[in-house]
Every structure is written in structure tokens, then in C-alpha cells.
Amino acid sequence: MTPAELSAALRDALTAAVAAGELTLDPADVPAEVRVERPKNRDHGDWATSVALQLAKKAGLPPREVAALVQRRLLEVEGVRAVDIAGPGFLNVTLDAAAAGELARSVVEAGPAFGRSATPTGERINLEFVSANPTGPIHLGGTRWAAVGDSLARVLEAAGATVTREYYFNDHGAQIDRFARSLLARANDEPAPEDGYGGDYVTDIAAAVLAEAPGLLDLPREEQQEVFRREGVELMFAEIRQSLAEFGVEFDVYFHEDSLHTSGAVGRAVQKLRDLGRIYEADGATWLRTSDFGDDKDRVVIKSDGHPAYISGDLAYYLDKRERGFDRCVLMLGADHHGYVPRMMAMCAAFGDTPGVNLEILIGQMVNLLKDGVPVRMSKRAGTVVTMEDLVEAVGVDAARYSLVRSSVDSSIDIDLDLLTRRSNDNPVFYVQYAHARTANVAVNAAAAGVRREDAFDPSLLTEETESLLLAALAEFPAVVARAGELREPHRVARYLEELAGRFHKFYDACRVTPRAGEEVTDVHRTRLWLNDATRQVLANGLGLLGVSSPDRM
């Protein structure tokens, strides 16, 4: 019995109690999905639910009486061995061995779909992440967002949402001018501007621009700078896109900031806010009443010289997303943008939307790279920062992605290069991938020994403690995925996989899938092969959500 099947049985029990007049509830008050969770203490059963506590007030009954009505009906369900009422009205459900073991076949038959919602939510989410300026390679912070953002997109899709991955291409503003001046100086063998960009990549980009335009340095200096601005940004952005693709991250939309200003989108956004009464004029400038919506002060949107302020682009971009039909706009920002959150939320509210619903902002903390216990602060190519390429070159894509996504974005993380290249159980990505490789090896050995799944499946035989614990872990996967999407926390999937891998390794040590020399193949072996293959499937599904490969050999 799967958690979804138990949830449905609980709902049926509640519905039957309402129909019999034993439970005074509007049928609409019976939850469409009754939440079941693993008890912290396994002595309290396989699954627990607090649904009786949730419905008691509406039903006008003590929670334990509501629980008793459910208990009586649930005990009639095939596969339910015991239902106990605990504390104020919790229901603890114990399944019989066959019902619990049936999950192994359910997982294998579902295949890649196991853990994914079968019902689309209808929700359209715009997930914007990385959005690094095209003035240099992606640094470690952007690399973390690439790993977390892409994994979150995969998790949200698995939970039933439609997700658009979007990269905001910052090709408008002062940083682009500084980049152009840096390229110009490098091409002319001049010192870099005081506020410019350094690193070997600037030399590479400048040389590439000159190769495409051999007579460029013969032009007037202003024309040179404009060419370096245009061509340098394109070359840098092409390099960024290539790095992301090699990292396994593909965006659906690359949105150019400059288009907001050239298309009139900024003016339209300001006018919409004016029509809503959110705009006023003062000191020769145009202001947005953000202080009415929680910001510490009002913000200038059009400066006194007539030029748009920085926030004007944010206004136009947010409105553009909403007009494209997105219900939720999820934005990932680095810790240095923390102070920017109140004005963004105020902007959302000024348009008549709901902050935290139509606009969500996730703030990520710092990433530190360690080698031999010492922080790595310099890149071979970028000069002052460590880049995505540096990390991938050191440990590979799988280890880089996994290590960046396995911790909550709320916390700073230290990436130990020595640990991530170690083939040992204290290396988390190796530990999980090795579990998958072990399941693959078990399947190969089973085939060689004549153990075939299709010959038998008797879940009542899965009674060993390590088998029960492994089945319990497998059953949790759909809820882990759903919760990770709901909370925007893909690290939950990684931590779950580590727990699952641990339980599989214990099962592997305790339970033989193939008979010893001279022994006959039994239904125990065949049924354990189902459990092995179910574990293999869930490990692959979970690693896939993180953008990490599931190797058959290590």
C-alpha cells in the first residue's frame, strides 16, 4: 500500500462516516488529500495522521471520537493490520507485511514517474536564476544558483507545475560601459580603468573582438568602445551560455534588460502605476509610493534629468512576466541583494499583486571553496574570483552540482575539494551514486544467477528489519518531492537520497538477492530483487531531480 492509497482510504473512511450521519460535516470539509507522515518512533506504526484533530472542531466532537470513527472503518481496509489512537487523537496505522511490501512493485512499475505528481497543478511559475552580468565568467555564487535553480525547476515540474527557466540578461547600464572600457584598454595595451574588470578573460575577449574586426583600432576611440561594448558582451554571454550548458542547465528564456528600455516597456509600467494612483511628482522627479507597501521610503522611478532610475527596469520586467501569464514569479538573489527585497515586494503590491504569492524572492548565502583546508580565492582566468569552470575542472559536474544543492540556500557552505574527489562514504555524492551502482550490480549478478523478477513477487516475504526500513524510505519519496517544491528547498531531495542510500547499504549487507553457491533460487530472492530494483529507480529519479547522473558502475 502506497501513502497515496492510504490517504485515499482515510478519505473514504471520513466520507463514509459523514454519509452515515456519524460525523456532522459538510462533504466539502473532508480534505481531498489526507496527509500521512512517518512517525518519528517506528514503534508507533508505519504511518500517522492528525486528520481527526483537524476536523474535530467543525464536527463538534472530541478529536478521539472522530479518530474512533475513522479507526473502525480503516480496520476493514485490506492491508491495514492495526490502527491505534494516540494522545489527543492521532491515528497510527500499521500495515501488514504484504501491503507494505507491495510498494516495491508499485515503484518498479511506475518507473521514472514515481515521485512525480500525476495531476498538473495548473500553476505557471517563472523561475529566474543566475542572471549574472555579462561582464565576466560565472562566479561561485552564480554557480550555486545554477545548481539550486535548475534543481528547483525540476522539483516544481515533478510536483505538477509548469516552470519557465529564465535568465535576465543585464545588457543595460554602467557595468556594461565599464566592461567595454576594460576591453578597449586591454586591446590598446593600456592600464585597466580604475573601476574596470581584470583577469585573463578580458584579454581573451578583447583578442576575439579584434580578430572579428581587424581594423577596429583605426576607428575613433568612441566608435571602438561601442564595438567592444556590443561584440564583447555577445562573446561573454555566449561563453556564459556554454558554461551553463556544460553544467547541465538550459534556460527557456534569455530576457534582455535593454529591450525594456527600447520597447517602451518602462514607460508602460510607470503609466500603469500612475493609473493606479501609485505615482507622484516631486523635486523634478517621478516617484513610486513604495512606503505605502512596507518599503522604508518612496523610490524615484524617473530621475530629474529624465532618465529612468534602476528600479524602473524592475517594474517593467515584473509587469512583463505577469502579462506573459505567470501566476508566480520566483526570483533568486545573492546575499548582497538582501536589502533590495522590501522595495521589490512593495513594487509587487503597488501593482495590486500579493507579495509572497505573485512574487517570491529567495536569498542565497556565500560559497567558500577549500583546498587542503585553505580557502581558494583566485581563479586562473578570472583573476579575483573563483568561477564555475574552476569548480567543474576540480571535481566534475556531478560533484559540483550535488555539493551546491545539498544545503539550504539560507546557509553559507564550504566546498571541500579534497572531500569531493575522494571515493569514500564521507563524500556525499559518491555515497549516493555508489548506492545506485550497487543496485545495478545486484541486478547484473541476479540475472547471472537466474533470479528473475517476473518469476515471482511475494511481498509478505519482506519481513527483515532492513527490508522494512528500506520500504519505508522508498514510500517517503513522493512526499519529499512535494514538500521540496512547496518550500522551494531542493536540498531536501539530496538529504533524502543520502538517507535512502544508507538504508540500502544496510539492506545490501544483511539480505542476499542472489543465492549462495549450491543454494536454490527462492521467491525471497526474487522478491528482494524487486526491492533492489525499486531502490535503483528511486535513486535515479532523485538524482535526476538534482541534475546528477546515476552511474551503473563506479
From Swiss-Prot:
Subcellular location: Cytoplasm
Keywords of the record: Aminoacyl-tRNA synthetase, ATP-binding, Cytoplasm, Ligase, Nucleotide-binding, Protein biosynthesis
Catalyzed reaction equations: tRNA(Arg) + L-arginine + ATP = L-arginyl-tRNA(Arg) + AMP + diphosphate
One biological process term in Gene Ontology: arginyl-tRNA aminoacylation
GO cellular component, one term: cytoplasm
InterPro entries from the UniProt entry: aa-tRNA-synth_I_CS, Arg-tRNA-ligase, Arg-tRNA-synth_N, Arg-tRNA-synth_N_sf, ArgRS_core, DALR_anticod-bd, Rossmann-like_a/b/a_fold, tRNAsynth_Ia_anticodon-bd
Domain of life, per lineage: Bacteria
Motif ('HIGH' region): 132-142
The protein's Enzyme Commission number: 6.1.1.19
Gene Ontology MF term list: arginine-tRNA ligase activity; ATP binding
PANTHER family per record: ARGININE--TRNA LIGASE, CYTOPLASMIC (PTHR11956:SF5), ARGINYL-TRNA SYNTHETASE (PTHR11956)
Self-association and partners: Monomer.
Protein name per Swiss-Prot or TrEMBL: Arginine--tRNA ligase
